[in-house]
Amino acid sequence: MPVPRHALADFVTAQWQRRGWFAWAMLPFSLLFGLIARVRRHGYQRGWFKSTRLPMPVVVVGNVTVGGTGKTPAVIALAQALTEAGLRPGVVSRGYGVELKHPRRVKPTSKASDVGDEPLLIARATDVPVWVFPDRALCAQTMLVSHPGVNVLLLDDGLQHYKLQRDFEIVMFDSRMGGNGLLLPAGPLREPLSRPRDATLINDPNFRATPDRPGMYGMRLELDDAWQLADPTMARPVSAFAGRRVLAAAGIGNPERFFASLRGAGLTPKTLPLPDHYDFVADPFVDHPDALDADVILITEKDAVKCERFDDPRIWVVPTRPVIDAGLIEKIRRAVLAQIKPAPTAPATTPGAAGRNEEHRDGQPAA
């Protein structure tokens, strides 16, 4: 049997959506966590800790909540949009769950076990340099040596990585927004909802940007045709699986988002939620009763990069196409072009971590 999503983790996640006994019991620890986070952030802003300024604009895509909000598809969409705008973006990520001794380039032929599932997905979906290492500043500097033509950096999931100065911050949420609005461990927040940012991006198909909420934009994930894992040349619409016995499996931060999208396409799948970044070293389908009974097994692109060794014609991969409000794309493009210098110099380590262009900060709360 596969490793199930941890019962304790599911319990805590559910508690984070309300202000019940758990939230109040954890509140003293949240106050301490908030104090430490505030001191750390202000310490970088005031120059108490060293940070690195790159010779190019840095756009950060991250979240103030724990868990997946759709950052990877957002980075993919932004990389594609900036490339279409004539810019030359590069992407730096941490490489979650991978032990790295030095910065490593992610190629489309890389293995997820060597570079991480999300960076590999970005590398395969875009034609931009992608590098991984926990020290994002060093990683970016190393990338620039190999790719000196890069003139804008996308920092994947680096909102709290203040060692690298930034020029534009995007804070992402999904339909869960900020939960109960409390900091860890009483709630899901790493930082307060009121944290300043340049833009708020809501990954929710029902969200609509309106003039009374400036700085807030929407993103939706549209299902593309599914392709067969054993033979990627085989493709068909997801709706073609309607009426079949379908098992949907997902090892992502919010599996229910994937399951709901399949239901929206007319499917009634059995579901198998797996831990985020599940490594698929053990085959979760080999003795699972719903898998044994299924005609079709649907998985995400993020999981597919770790399932390539599986030889099961029932497994189909469901890609998603991220669509971001054009207003955010244009706002980022203007901010980036305003920062690009004609003759960049070598990156340098300087005191002070904010390094942010306050002209673009709107301070818009998320909720």
Curated annotation (Swiss-Prot):
EC number(s) per entry: 2.7.1.130
Entry keyword set: ATP-binding, Kinase, Lipid A biosynthesis, Lipid biosynthesis, Lipid metabolism, Nucleotide-binding, Transferase
Disulfide bonding pattern of the chain: none
Pfam families for the chain: LpxK
Compositionally biased residues, Basic and acidic residues: 356-367
Enzyme class: transferase
Family assignment from sequence similarity: Belongs to the LpxK family.
Function: Transfers the gamma-phosphate of ATP to the 4'-position of a tetraacyldisaccharide 1-phosphate intermediate (termed DS-1-P) to form tetraacyldisaccharide 1,4'-bis-phosphate (lipid IVA).
Name of protein: Tetraacyldisaccharide 4'-kinase
Chain's gene name: lpxK
